[in-house]
Amino acid sequence: MRHYPFQDFLKFGITTVTVLSAVGLAGCTGSPERTVTEDYPIFDQQATDQDVPSIAHSQDLAADMELPAKDVRWVGQHDGTDFYATLGESQTSDDDHVLCFIIAAHEFEVAGASCSSDPYDPSDPVRQARVGSTAGAVQAFLIPANAQLEQADGWYRASEHVVVLTDPSAQSELTGRLPDHTEITLQRITG
């Protein structure tokens, strides 16, 4: 059988293509999970004076939760209510964080928070909180940056990270998706 010089090149080329294809496929088999700071890049920013809760109720709440001021971020305001996101340390690992959402309703002189008990889970990136008094109630949601939501009456996007339920008789849920196509659902608390 006759040997041609290009046959050696073809063998090398086929091997190279096979190796590169395997490396390329290995890179596509799974993408790393999003982190809390990817979903909430506000935590990569330096804290400012605006990040300090402005009423005693929310300051006390942050202190009770043992959250250092450097881990609290103001994320929006709507109708006299301020919203804050906080990062706390996980009970299970120093490398993991729990995400909390604080509502400081000045008009009703009440504050409340919602925290996950488990480390941040990118498949469940939304936090919901509701505070109320005899004077009224506020229900809101903390959502990741760049979330795309459907529009619906009774739901108001107060900032990049905050959606407020403005009408308690609005549809019961609002759906959306994150840039990586993770679907999210905001569900109204009833009762």
Regions found by a protein language model. Give the residues of each.
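Extracellularly exposed regions in secreted/surface proteins, prominently low-complexity, repeat-rich
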Residues: 141-191
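Bacterial N-terminal signal peptides that target proteins for export
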Residues: 2-15
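Mature extracytoplasmic domains of secretory-pathway proteins
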Residues: 73-150
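Repetitive helical segments and hydrophobic/amphipathic motifs
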Residues: 17-20
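C-terminal motif of bacterial Sec signal peptides marking the signal peptidase cleavage site
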Residues: 24-27
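Extracytoplasmic low-complexity, Pro/Thr/Ser/Ala/Gly-rich segments
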Residues: 29-98, 181-191
